[in-house]
Swiss-Prot record:
Similarity annotation: Belongs to the NAD kinase family.
Broad enzyme group: transferase
Protein name as it appears in the record: NAD kinase
HAMAP family: NAD_kinase
Cellular localization per UniProt: Cytoplasm
Taxonomic placement: Bacteria, Pseudomonadati, Chlorobiota, Chlorobiia, Chlorobiales
Co-factor requirement: a divalent metal cation
Length: 288
């Protein structure tokens, strides 16, 4: 068994944890390799470019927050990912720093379980070539710096759903429902639900609401505007500036992400903990 390790190099505590992890693995004679930027910060030559890690390892370890895990998952493809939370919220990162070594031991002895998460596949023309872009959380088309409110045209399986005057459109998986979509007013969806959610960003009409659809649907989105260019983001990464009337097609990807599960956590507990549900808030009093 060989691990590929990806570290959020902007966090000193993540780098410190990576050093401790390397020592722990060395003591047990377990093979590992760092992603190149992580290795540079840790001053080790045991590294490979992120694009090549998949062919050098059997599993990935992500040391950071949800953003680091999203980044790692794109290169892990179907190989298992152990997400260790060294960030803030940590919806996707299953393990605390204190739980990291136990999680790795379970992977080593084959006693771990896997959470399989669906992804989105966005088909778009880039440099005159059809490209397939994967996203674990969401695909987002925004108005960007466009000075007016554009109209987003959405079709489901070729049939017109509606046209939205809005600042953007979020298409999210159940995994991504607690990310940007939730901030824009979208519903929270349990992880194993076979659905997607389409969430408008700041729609011009109050009657416009997010819609939950089957993940078997094929979604087509285009921007109706006389000019301008519109950012297409997959999991927060800019992939292309869309032209007016240019369409993208979003469907369920044939590739799923495999996250190593923390059997000591359940989804309801995560929601209560991360979103502070059921807690009394003391905002203080105003002196008269």
């Amino acid at each position: 068994m060989k691990f590929a390790i990806v570290v959020n190099v902007t966090r000193q505590n993540a780098l410190d944890l990576a050093r401790n992890l390397a020592l722990w693995l060395d003591e047990r004679k377990v093979a590992y390799i760092f992603e190149s930027l992580s290795a540079e910060k840790l001053q080790t030559d045991n590294s490979a470019p992120i694009e090549e890690l998949n062919k050098h390892c059997d599993a990935f370890i992500s040391l950071g927050g949800d953003g680091t895990l999203l980044f790692t998952s794109h290169y892990a493809v179907t190989k298992p990912v152990i997400g260790v939370n060294v960030g803030y919220l940590g919806f996707l990162t299953e393990f605390t720093q204190a739980e990291m070594f136990t999680a790795i031991e379970r992977v080593l002895n084959g006693s771990n379980t896997i959470h399989t998460r669906s992804q989105l596949d966005a088909t778009v023309l880039i440099d005159n070539e059809v490209q397939h872009l994967r996203a674990l959380n969401d695909v987002v088309i925004e108005k960007g710096a466009y000075p007016r409110i554009p109209t987003f045209i959405i079709k489901l399986d070729g049939e017109l759903l509606s046209s939205y005057r809005a600042d953007g459109i979020i298409i999210a998986t159940s995994t991504g429902s607690t990310a940007y979509s939730m901030s824009a007013g979208g519903p929270i969806i349990a992880p194993k639900s076979s659905v997607f959610v389409i969430t408008p960003i700041c729609p011009h009409m109050l009657t416009v609401r997010p819609i939950v659809i089957s993940d078997e649907k094929i979604i087509e989105v285009s921007v109706d505007a006389p000019d301008g260019s519109f950012p297409l983001n997959c999991d927060g990464n800019l992939k292309k500036m869309l032209d007016p009337q240019e369409s993208i097609t979003v469907r369920k990807s044939t590739v799923a992400i495999n996250l190593v599960a923390n059997e000591n956590r359940d989804y309801c507990e995560i929601l209560r903990t991360k979103l502070l549900w059921g807690r009394e808030h003391n905002f203080g009093t105003i002196d008269s």
